[in-house]
Amino acid sequence: HIYGISKLIKAEDQFSSFDYENDNYLFEIKSRRKAYDPWIIEQLKLDTNIGLAESVKKDFIYVNEFEGFLYIWNISKLIRQDYDFRFHSRKMPWQTDFDRTQTVNKMTGYLYNKDATIVDTKSTNP
């Protein structure tokens, strides 16, 4: 157990909206090539994972990884605290790593580093 979190279980379906789960949480984990502040979160992914998490009485955790740093937000907790994601329509690539020329409008919001738990995995000894 790291940080008191029970063992993570990988989602069985490769097309699942979340990546891992444990007794208390659903996790979506993204590895990024750049660090941002704010980070972007898609409203559809947020809504889907919040709905799933609530249906199984868990919290939804969103993690962005960049060069060994984890930026972690408890989205369920932020919603309970009336966090303003500032959702708006934004033109984005249809898919992250494939055809970058095809774009689509997506509803996106923001997550700020000041609202994240930031973990340096390179200097942490569990």
Predicted regions and their residues:
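Short beta-strand
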Residues: 9-13, 62-64
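Conserved catalytic cores of phosphodiester-cleaving nucleases, focusing on short active-site segments
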Residues: 20-35
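Short glycine-/polar-rich loops that comprise or flank the Walker A/P-loop
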Residues: 56-60
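Beta-rich catalytic cores
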Residues: 16
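Short beta-strand scaffold segments in enzyme catalytic cores
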Residues: 19-20, 62
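Mg2+/Mn2+-dependent nuclease catalytic core
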Residues: 31-55
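Acidic-basic catalytic patches of nuclease active cores, encompassing PD-(D/E)XK
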Residues: 1-11
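Non-catalytic C-terminal interaction segments of nucleic acid-processing enzymes
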Residues: 2, 55, 66-126
